[in-house]
């Protein structure tokens, strides 16, 4: 299933989502402008290398400096290829505006970064000796998906399912689409631990950590109905679609 439309209407322009997408794209364009050696140095400095933190925790004196903390944030603005970037930004573009609309711009930015950091910590915890740099916005975006499922479990997501090269379009409930995605992350994460406990090519546990953070945190910071408006879990009330048509 590939999502192509989020049917929940929004009221305000998603300024922070636009900024996040632009920042990720600019960072990626900078990445591909580098030589292979320069790119390797960039990734080992600003992407997330779990073994680095295991060494810090194993030392007698834990005294983290800015170079140790920075990758927890910067890793979520780096990507490993065009497809990696496009899939992440597409998902953020579909679901980010809805959550930004409900949280407000400043809260949404803090929420997004927090989910990204929790995702980084989860990846370190489950892959403590990995020397493979982890990078990508998917952990933070997983937090957006978790919050979307929490706030609008009965919202409809339009997805396309290609069967024998024929695209079929369906409307599914958010709890089904996002829940299925989360279940796949858990299964893949468990399989990864069982098969390759010292190496993680995909940061499954970062996705899981970000999702759980988003699902748990969003009720605490969502705007009250007095500041926004009353809204429903599906937003499909009174027989109107998001454009106001019957």
Predicted regions and their residues:
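A detector for small-residue-rich transmembrane helices and their helix-helix packing motifs
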Residues: 1-246
